[in-house]
Amino acid sequence: LLDVDFGTYPFVTSSNTTAAGACTGLGIAPNKVKDVFGIFKAYTTRVGSGPFPTEDFEEAGQTMAKVGNEFGSVTGRARRCGWLDLVALKYAVQVNGVTQLYMMKGDVLSGFDTLQVCTGYNYKGQKIQHLPYNIEPENVTPIFTEMKGWKADLTGMTTYDELPQELKTYIEFIEKEV
């Protein structure tokens, strides 16, 4: 959502942050790229200002920032953290032509009793499942699906089979929705 062409203008960077933009920056023809890997966090973060419908201003967001080490490398300021926004993730997958999707930082969510996952928005009184043109907070309210959290320490787990069932369910839900 920070891309100069496909992001939430004016809260964007000055360059293209998409897979196509990477091709341009590297001087590689897009038809030479076989696979586009999409890597996302198990929760959502945003640097700086701009719309962030799933931002959590309470303890959950603070916990994600602390456990996930979500602090700027130069300023040391905490990044804005919130629940996973599948609407934004689907948009990123679509715009980038993602062929394989990888989740990271699932361990940051260990210890939460419940998790919220945004599956759509209430936009001006209507339910939608796409990013609206005007995504300002006063126009958009996230629609959350609540899921069971997990308590397990994921350190040292190296296979899918070792993961707690609640995390597997979380992953499978994302796979189904995206």
Task: Enumerate the predicted regions with their spans.
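Non-transmembrane, aqueous-exposed alpha-helical and coiled segments at domain scale
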Residues: 1-178
